[in-house]
């Protein structure tokens, strides 16, 4: 019995030992399998990542080619243009004996970009041909996350699809393929859909009570604060639309220099040159829908359609000392290609020795104009030269009618502190000629006076009797300052209108040249309405006058973008339009001040919503380009 029990015990032990060995072997096998599988998965993941990086890199290359083409074409481009540009494609060096190539079996010899027919979005367009540009549609401006990139803004969007498919054979003869695509968009954004667009810092330092509706954007810093003019926290500044900024937002009472360390080196942080300054006080404007809903930090809008740094070689006057005077600043938009303003003497200098880039040439108001009037003077003799371009034709009698609408006078500009020789253009006298069907006028008039002898001899253009404008729209451009006297574009239905100038000053219906040099009490304004877009220069805060070397104070802000010279007390300046600041003034560089210069009007300002679908002739557009997320296919 003892022997039997012993044998049974030994047998049980053997069985247990065998079971343990079996389990151990099984575990080892499982571990080997898991390790092998994990290694294969790691290899596969690494291989996949390599292929994905190559594919996404190829698409980034294609995107760079696309950006170059749209920026040099200044608009959407055809499939053929892109295909020709993508003949040379990036190649990928072998890594660890593994080569990555384009998947020829799927039709890819490199990355591809094709225009998207918007029919897939529910709009009926015909098939795209190789040489046709993709169609455009009006869209809100969104970023690649689907969020509104510039809240409230609309653009004309042209979409493309960039795609590539790549293949590679890795160790173990494993073939891996990867396809990726993304949408890319070229969107033109009319600038005349904003109440105000500033290329530089936009300031509104505690203005008299005012409400600004519509969109407001600055490519610089937005410095806005409310309060009654000159001090106190009364009054109000209200934005009813969206305000967007690029480099910063500030709502203190020291809008420009308070956070500027350079300024602090030469100024006291507890004093300021603005009347009523209160150190470290903040008076934020009113935002009816809430700050978070109305104020947005955004990326730049390019007002020239491309990156300005690629075509403009210098900062605005007084620093435009580059060898090529045809690329000094965005002020080129209001200058003819053969003149420039000397930043020291203010003389309009004629020259044909500087080249014009296509990007600038296409945007000059002078180049767009159908009728051009040049004023020159020798002694007491004034000569008017009228020429046509862009399809316009004028008879000798019509040219005479236009010159008869011009007259010479002089007035004192209290802000400039000097007499100004003014050429007045009587629109009522010129209207029948500008409206004549035989003239084939495109609605853009360019007029300039190049006879200034220097800083103390400024010349300007004045628009008078402009309540009725040419029926198909009217844009006036000049490299001189422009005065708008009296009601403008107010008779009957408003027409799309714009004024491009070195500076724009509003003179009321009550203005008299004979009182221009008198005290402020002799320059009483009355209610006046102006309906036009304004594109002009500005004198920024802390600007250094290159002639006097004086450092200026506050710019006067957005509320003084159109300038004033009268006592507007209890009178209203009604304005409907769009205000665009792109450059520093080169001629009208007098320092902003109230005092004896003017007393502010009641401001009833609003955006002209007609501009959205019917902008003025020669309108400007900004451009944004964007990319969607990578999508595997």
Outline where the language-model segments fall:
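Long amphipathic alpha-helical scaffold segments
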Residues: 166-169, 181-183
């Amino acid at each position: 019995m003892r022997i039997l029990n012993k044998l049974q015990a030994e047998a049980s032990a053997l069985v247990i030992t065998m079971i343990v060995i079996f389990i151990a072997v099984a575990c080892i096998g499982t571990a080997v399998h898991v390790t092998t599988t994990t290694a294969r998965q790691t290899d596969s993941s690494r291989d996949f990542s390599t292929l994905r990086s190559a594919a996404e890199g190829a698409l980034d290359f294609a995107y760079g080619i696309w950006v170059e083409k749209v920026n040099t074409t200044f608009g959407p481009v055809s499939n053929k243009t892109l295909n020709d540009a993508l003949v040379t494609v990036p190649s990928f060096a072998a890594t660890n004996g593994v080569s990555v190539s384009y998947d020829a079996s799927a039709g890819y010899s490199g990355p591809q970009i094709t225009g998207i027919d918007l029919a897939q979005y529910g709009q009926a367009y015909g098939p795209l041909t190789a040489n046709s540009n993709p169609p455009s549609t009006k869209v809100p401006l969104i970023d690649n996350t689907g969020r509104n990139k510039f809240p409230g803004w609309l653009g004309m969007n042209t979409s493309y699809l960039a795609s590539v498919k790549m293949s590679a054979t890795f160790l173990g003869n494993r073939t891996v393929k990867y396809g990726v695509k993304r949408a890319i968009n070229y969107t033109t954004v009319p600038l005349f859909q904003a109440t105000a667009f500033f290329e530089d810092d936009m300031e509104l330092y505690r203005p008299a009570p005012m409400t600004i509706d519509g969109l407001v954007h600055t490519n610089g810093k937005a410095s806005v604060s409310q309060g009654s003019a000159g001090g106190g926290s009364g009054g109000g500044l209200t934005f009813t639309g969206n305000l967007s900024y690029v480099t910063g937002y500030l709502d203190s009472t020291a809008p420009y220099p308070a956070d500027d360390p350079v300024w602090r080196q030469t100024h006291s942080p507890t004093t300021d040159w603005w009347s009523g300054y209160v150190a470290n006080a903040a008076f934020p404007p009113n935002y009816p829908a809430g700050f978070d809903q109305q104020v947005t930090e955004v990326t730049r809008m390019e007002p020239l359609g491309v990156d300005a740094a690629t075509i403009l070689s210098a900062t605005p006057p007084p620093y435009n000392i580059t060898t090529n005077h045809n690329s000094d600043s965005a002020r080129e938009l209001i200058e003819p290609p053969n003149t420039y303003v000397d930043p020291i003497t203010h003389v309009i200098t004629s020259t044909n020795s500087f080249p014009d880039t296509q990007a600038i040439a296409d945007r000059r108001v002078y180049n767009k104009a159908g009728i051009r009037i040049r004023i020159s003077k020798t002694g007491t003799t004034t000569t008017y030269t009228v020429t046509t371009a862009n399809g316009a034709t004028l008879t000798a009698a019509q040219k005479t009618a236009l010159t008869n609408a011009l007259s010479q006078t002089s007035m004192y500009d209290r802000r400039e502190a000097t007499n100004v020789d003014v050429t007045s253009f009587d629109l009522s006298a010129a209207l029948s000629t500008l409206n004549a069907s035989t003239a084939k006028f495109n609605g853009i008039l360019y007029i300039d006076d190049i006879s200034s002898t220097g800083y103390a001899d400024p010349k300007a253009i004045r628009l008078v009797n402009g309540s009725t404008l040419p029926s198909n729209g009217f844009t006036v451009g000049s490299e001189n300052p422009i005065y708008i006297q009296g009601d403008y574009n107010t008779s009957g239905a408003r027409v799309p209108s714009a004024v491009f100038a070195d500076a724009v000053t509003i003179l009321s219906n009550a203005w008299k040249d004979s009182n221009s040099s008198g005290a402020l009490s002799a320059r009483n304004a009355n209610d006046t309405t102006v309906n036009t877009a304004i594109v002009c220069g500005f004198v920024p805060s802390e600007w250094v006058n290159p002639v006097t070397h004086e450092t200026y104070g506050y710019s006067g802000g957005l509320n003084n973008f159109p300038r004033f010279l009268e006592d507007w007390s209890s009178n209203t300046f009604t304005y409907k339009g769009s205000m665009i600041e792109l450059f520093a003034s080169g001629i009208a560089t007098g320092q902003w001040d109230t005092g004896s210069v003017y007393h502010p009007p009641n401001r009833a300002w609003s955006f002209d919503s007609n501009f959205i679908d019917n902008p003025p002739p020669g309108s400007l557009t900004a451009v944004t380009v964007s990319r969607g997320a990578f999508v595997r296919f």
